[in-house]
Amino acid sequence: MIKSPSSLEKTNLAPALSQVSSDYDSVRALILKALAVIRSDNFDEYFDLFSEDAIWMMPSKYSDVNKAGARNFYRFTAKFRFDQTTSIDELVVADDWAFVRVSFDGYLRPKFEDGSPPLRSVSRHIWILKRELDGSWKIARDIWNNPRDLG
């Protein structure tokens, strides 16, 4: 695990290690933003965090889905919002790539009171991130499943 930014100020780091810390912090900030957006009422902002060539590997599907296909899949978020706890299970940054294992556990709740009950929503994801040409980080792949065994 990389030290927190406040503890890094107290040490003399080689430039390469300092860059690793900066990359880790940037990736972590992007992931935390993604988790906040997912739980917000502005789900469309989620897609801004993905690269233009992003691919989703959906559960139980043979074909991959591009950003337009993912927008289509998530159109239900116009009526429902995610009310989930999240867990960042692993975060690794290596050069221009990073990956994150993240778990979601909770419910989809109606945004508007229409008598619909909440729907159970549990998923586990691997997000693969890449550094863009401008130096920013974007999510490039979302590989996920819906576990049958809810632990």
Indicate residue ranges for each PLM-predicted region.
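A solvent-exposed, acidic/Ser-Thr-rich amphipathic alpha-helical stretch
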Residues: 43-94, 103, 107, 119
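Short strand-connecting beta-turns/loops that link adjacent beta-strands
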Residues: 93-96, 133-135
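Short, low-complexity N-terminal intrinsically disordered segments enriched in polar/charged residues
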Residues: 1-52, 93, 150-151
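Short beta-strand edge/turn micro-motifs at domain boundaries
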Residues: 2-15, 120-151
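Beta-strand secondary-structure signal
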Residues: 99-105, 124-128
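Short, cysteine-centered beta-strand-loop-beta hairpins and adjacent loop/turn segments enriched
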Residues: 107-119, 148-149
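Short, conserved clusters of charged catalytic residues that mark active-site
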Residues: 29-30, 83-86, 124
